[in-house]
Each structure stands twice: as structure tokens, then as C-alpha cells.
Amino acid sequence: MIKLTSLVKAAGUAAKLGPAGLEDALSGILGKGDDPNLLVGPETADDAGVYRIGEGLALVDTVDIITPLVDDPFTFGRIAAANALSDVYAMGGRPVTAMNLAFFPACTLPGQILADIMAGGLDAVREAGACLVGGHTVEDHELKYGLSVTGLISPGRIVRNSTARPGDRLILTKPLGTGIVSTAIKADMVAPGVVDEAIRWMALLNASAAGLMLECEASACTDVTGFGLLGHACEMARGAGVTLEIALDAVPLMGGVEDLVADGLVPAGCYRNRDHYTPLVSVSAGAGGRLIPLFDPQTSGGLLITLSPQFADSFLSMARDRGLFAVAVGGVLPPREHAVVIA
């Protein structure tokens, strides 16, 4: 089998621009604009855009492309598609159509690999109940694949990343560690069981967690992806004008992640996230390297959801009954000096 991860410089969402470079590039175009039908634009770094097309109906639009973070083509395609679909789920929407976006080194890889990647993507799209309607390819020296996704939503049901309220509780629906495990895969320094667990989480759609989020009237949500848990928590806090408190000991990690960090198998994107967001985070003495997984760029990560205490209890109970993963990791405070406080 061709080792896809050996063909790229960085894997998965760890290959994205760091937050500092992205903010600089976008600084001149941020702002929602004056179209009254544009309900969610780029102004709060939300997961997708939302555009009203009629009374009681709006489109949710997103795009996400990643480099290989596993070596099996079908699995890579499935994970990349799950990662792209997640943005629609995080907004409370329902995916309806998707388009392939493939950047492929046709001179060095057989075409069957691209076919297998797109088959994996189609598998996830079909599970989401959406239709694959086309796509676009580019011959490139480095392999990349993803989807543009369009969803539907009622304007009154949009769940934004900027509407957390003091007193809410904070819930996470997948453990952390995909960037660290992917770095170890690329280096051939990880046990198969650790890889298998990470793949299960990355291939899992956020559909069920998002459905439960809507049932429990979440106040805010984002999916944890390239900026890591702390980066996305900072964006939530800044957008809402609040402070998020995260209990370090409550944050779930995938199996083997702490050992991989101790071995130095940490993606460069993790350090970019740390450098950018650390000034916004208050850390108790002694946390040290324990924070590394919280800055780890996630691919197809879980939802980070805020709910009122009553609904948070219901969410956790219903998740348990339905066999869904969900952990309370903190809460929402009135604004303090820092966007995030690590307890």
C-alpha cells in the first residue's frame, strides 16, 4: 500500500494556515456586508455561512479540504468528507448537497487511489442523507481532498459560535488527539490500536450529536478543528463577550495521546495555535505540557456546545442513553481579562 501520509508536508487540519496568518489575510475582507439576507458571514469566524432564500428557509454553505492523515485512500476520503459535513452540523443545519474537491498528483499516483478516496467521501455523504452533485479536480504535486457542502436550516434555528451565555455549561462530544496521532502515523511511531481508535472518531459524523444539540436548545456551538479546543474556545468567548472556563482534568483524550506527546510527536500546527492563543488563556501554575493536546489541530473533531444547566443535564443523560459520547468540560462565565480560563 502506498503511504499517503508520506507524500504531504502536514496531515489533515494541521496543514491549514495558522490562526495568525489567516487573520492577517482576512483582515481586509471580514465583515458581514449589507445584504440583509446574509444571516451569518465571516465576522465571528463561524463554522459556515448562512444565507436566507425564503420565508423560514436558509442555505448553509461551507467548504473544507485536507491533506491525508491516514494511509488508506477510502478511509482518508471518508474522514475528509466527515470533516467537511461537520460545519453544517455545527450550525444546526441539514446537509443536502456536496461537491468533490480533489487535488491529485496524477504523475506519481495511480488513478485508482483517487477513485477510492472519492468512494470514501461518497460513503459519508450518503450516510448524511445528502447528494453528491459534482466536483472539481486540479492536478497538483500534493494530494488534497474535501467537499463543498450546502445545507438547509430554518433562520430561527441557527446555532452560532458567538451566542454563549454566562451560566451555561460546556460540553464536548469527541475526545482530542487526532493531530498528534496523525503526526505519529506519518512517522511510523504509533501502535495500530491507537490508530484504529483515532480513525473511528474521525470517521464518525457529528449528525447525532447535532440532532441532540437541537433537541436540548443549545445556546452556541462550534466544531473543534484546526485551531484546537482552546483556539475554538477563544473564538466562542470573544464572539459572545464572555469567558469560558475549562476544567483541564475533565478534557477527554484519545488513547495513547499523552505518550505520543511525551515522545515529541506533536504537529507544527499545535505550536502555531499555542503561540497565537496563549495570550488569551489564563493557565493555572503547573499545567505545562498538559495543555499541548488542547492546542492540537483536530480533523473531524467533536462539537463544543454550550447549554443551560438544565438542558446540559438532559443532553448528557440522553447522550448516554443513545450511546453517544459527551463530556462536560467546563462552563461560561461573565467576561474576565482572558477569553478562556483553565481550571
Swiss-Prot record:
Belongs to the selenophosphate synthase 1 family. Class I subfamily. Its cofactor is Mg(2+). It holds the Pfam family AIRS_C. This is Selenide, water dikinase. It is an enzyme of class 2 (transferase). Synthesizes selenophosphate from selenide and ATP. It comes from Geobacter metallireducens (strain ATCC 53774 / DSM 7210 / GS-15). Binds 1 Mg(2+) ion per monomer. Coiled coil: none annotated. Keywords: ATP-binding, Kinase, Magnesium, Metal-binding, Nucleotide-binding, Selenium, Selenocysteine, Transferase. One of its GO terms (molecular function) is magnesium ion binding. GO terms for biological process: selenocysteine biosynthetic process.
